Amino acid sequence: MDTLEEVTWANGSTALPPPLAPNISVPHRCLLLLYEDIGTSRVRYWDLLLLIPNVLFLIFLLWKLPSARAKIRITSSPIFITFYILVFVVALVGIARAVVSMTVSTSNAATVADKILWEITRFFLLAIELSVIILGLAFGHLESKSSIKRVLAITTVLSLAYSVTQGTLEILYPDAHLSAEDFNIYGHGGRQFWLVSSCFFFLVYSLVVILPKTPLKERISLPSRRSFYVYAGILALLNLLQGLGSVLLCFDIIEGLCCVDATTFLYFSFFAPLIYVAFLRGFFGSEPKILFSYKCQVDETEEPDVHLPQPYAVARREGLEAAGAAGASAASYSSTQFDSAGGVAYLDDIASMPCHTGSINSTDSERWKAINA
C-alpha cells in the first residue's frame, strides 16, 4: 500500500509529468510471464515457451527434408518450393530471436535489438499470410515463376510497411502497460495499433471464409479445398481474440494481457506448422495434391473449333498405342511447370481458361489430329 501511495504522489506532483499510462506497481501474473527469469538464470520463461515449438518444428522439417527435396525435384513446382523455403525461414528466425533474447542483458540497446528481432519475425510471418491469401484468391490458377515473383514482391512491400510502422511505434512510443522493472517488453506497437491491426485482419479472414456463401462465387474462381477456409477461419478467430484482449488493455483492464499473451504464443509458435499442415502436407504425402484447386465451369458451344487432346486410355482403344504413349505426357495438364525434350514449357491451369479450349504444342499438332480423327 505504501508503494501505491508513492506512485499516486508521483503522478500528482507538478514537478514530474504524468506518464501516458500508469505502470503496474504489483505486476500481474500475465505480465510476469513475459519477463520473469527461470531461477537465477537469465533465461525467461516466455522465450523458452516460444523456443521449444520452433525447435521441434525445425527438427521435423529437417527429418522430412530428404523426401521433400526428392518430391520437389520431381514436380519442379515453384509455389511449393516458395512456401517450403518461407516456412523454413520462419522457423529459423523464431529460434534466432528466442536465443538472442536469452543471451542479451536488460540494457536499452539489448531491448531494442530484441524488438527488432520480433519485427523481423513478424515480417516473415505476415509475408506468408498475405502470400497465401493472394495466391489463393487471385493467382491460385497461375503457378509460374513470374506470378510467384510478382506475389512475393507485393507481399514483401506490404509486410515491410507494416513492420516498419509497428517497429517505429514500439521503439519510439513503448506501451507503459508492458514496462517491467528496468526495461520495456515488446508490445507489438502498442494497444491501439494492436487493436486496429487485429480488427483489420479479422475482417479480411472473415470475408474469405464467407466468400463461398456469397454471389461472388459465381463470378470468380474460388479455391475448392476445405483446408484453405479452415486456415482462414483459424486466423480470423485468433485475430478476434487478440482484438478483444487489446480492447481490454485500452480500458486499462490488465486481464486483457492474458488474452494477448495466449494469441501471441499461438501465432509465433504454431503459424508455420499451420501452413505446413494446411497446404504442404498433402503435397509431401504419398499422393501429392494441387495447393489451390478450382472448380471448372463448363461452357457449352455449338461448334467447338479446338478440341482437348483425348486421354491416354481412349487413344489406346482406338489402336493408336504409339501416338497415345507420346501424347499422354503432353496431355497431362498441370498447374506447375514441367520439362520437355525441347526445353521448359508452361501450361495454364484448367481453371484459368474455358474447359472446351486448350493449347497444343506445335510439335504435336499432327499427332493430336490423328488422335481426334
From Swiss-Prot:
Highest taxon listed in the record's lineage: Eukaryota
What GO molecular function terms would the record report? G protein-coupled receptor activity
Where, subcellularly, is it found? Membrane
Residues that carry a glycan: 11, 23, 361
Protein name per Swiss-Prot or TrEMBL: Transmembrane protein adipocyte-associated 1
Q: Which BP terms in the Gene Ontology apply to this protein?
A: embryonic cleavage; G protein-coupled receptor signaling pathway; lipid metabolic process; negative regulation of mitotic cell cycle phase transition
Keyword list, A-Z: Glycoprotein, Membrane, Transmembrane, Transmembrane helix
Give the bilayer topology: Multi-pass membrane protein
Q: What is the lineage of its organism?
A: Eukaryota, Metazoa, Chordata, Craniata, Vertebrata
Gene Ontology CC? membrane; plasma membrane
Q: Where is the signal peptide?
A: none
Q: In which tissues is it expressed?
A: Ubiquitous, with higher levels in heart, placenta and kidney.
Family assignment? Belongs to the UPF0359 family.
Q: What's the main place this protein lives?
A: membrane
What residue ranges are annotated as transmembrane?
Answer: 48-68, 76-96, 123-143, 151-171, 192-212, 234-254, 265-285
